[in-house]
From Swiss-Prot:
Transmembrane segments: 31-51, 70-90
Annotated localization: Cell membrane
Role according to the record: Involved in cell division.
Predominant location: membrane
Any one biological process term the GO annotation gives: cell division
Domain of life: Bacteria
Record GO cellular component, one term: plasma membrane
The protein, known as: Cell division protein CrgA
Xref: NCBIfam families: PRK00159.1
């Protein structure tokens, strides 16, 4: 009786599935986006400077009387502009 051939055993291992996130390639941000977040940060800075230099005290001009009436809310408004601009920088490519 003829002898049968012995087949080589291939060790087949299942490769683990790669679960690494795929980064989506995004193009560069447009010019208006950069101007927007820089503008928001500058508006906040100017708001804070105008409040500190011109709208505080009894010598405040009549045009800035409304700003003096806001009182400490001026800090919140100025920092809200600046933080919004800062948060937009995180979306900049």
């Amino acid at each position: 009786m003829p002898k049968s051939k012995v087949r080589k055993k291939n060790d087949f291992t299942v490769k683990p599935v790669s679960r690494t996130p795929v980064k989506v390639k995004v193009g560069p941000s447009s010019v208006w986006f950069v101007a927007l977040f820089i503008g928001l940060m500058l508006i906040g800075l100017v708001w804070l400077m105008v409040f500190q230099l011109a709208a505080v005290g009894s010598q405040a001009p009549a045009a800035l009387n409304w700003m003096a009436q806001l009182g400490p809310w001026n800090y919140a408004i100025a920092f809200a502009f600046m933080i919004t601009g800062l948060l937009l920088t995180m979306r900049w490519h």
